[in-house]
Amino acid sequence: DCTILGAGGAAKAIAYALTTSNVKSISIINRSQENANQLSQWIQNNSNIRVTTTTPEHLSAVADLFINCTPLGMWPDTEQIPMNMDLVNNNHILVDTIYNPIETQWLKSGNAKGAKTIGGLDMFIAQGLASADIWFGKKISNQINVDIIRQILIEGKRFKRFPSIHFP
């Protein structure tokens, strides 16, 4: 079972990826029930996955995987978290789409409770590579060393300001 926190553009991209996986059910948690219902309908139109929607106040710990697609915890409001951490334990996986900071307070709290956590930096890099393919009109992303990009970004003062990368 998977829970998507949020129902915007990032949530739709995550939902698309989940529809191509072996996920059996998705729960969408969003402040706006209308947006959650729209995403739910999109998933149901494109898959056979069971989908439920609710608001953050009614979130439960039923899911194995929680994916944060909200801006909660993003710089400069880094202390915000998208869910009640009393629901998290060492059986959960927390995935954050936020890349600034690299490790959000939500992920730190999840780590402290023994959950497996995954930050949003790799998704950020993948978006950039996909954009480069579009900009250059050909697939150049497979020629780029992702490890170097990741290292540059990690060493870039934790994104307080993005490092200046100059192209020759």
Name each model-derived stretch:
Residues I4-L5, I28, D96:
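Hydrophobic Val/Ile/Leu positions in short beta-strands of Rossmann-like dinucleotide-binding domains
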Residues I49-A63, D86:
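Short acidic low-complexity segments
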Residues D1-T19:
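Glycine-rich adenosine-cofactor-binding loop
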Residues N142-P168:
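A short, charged, Gly/Pro-tolerant segment at domain boundaries
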Residues T20-S25, A112-K116:
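Conserved S-adenosyl-L-methionine
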Residues S21-N46:
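NAD(P)-binding Rossmann-fold cofactor-contacting core
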Residues N84, N90-N142, I148:
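Rossmann-fold NAD(P)-binding glycine/threonine-rich loop
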Residues S32, H58-I81, V95:
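Rossmann-like NAD(P)-binding element
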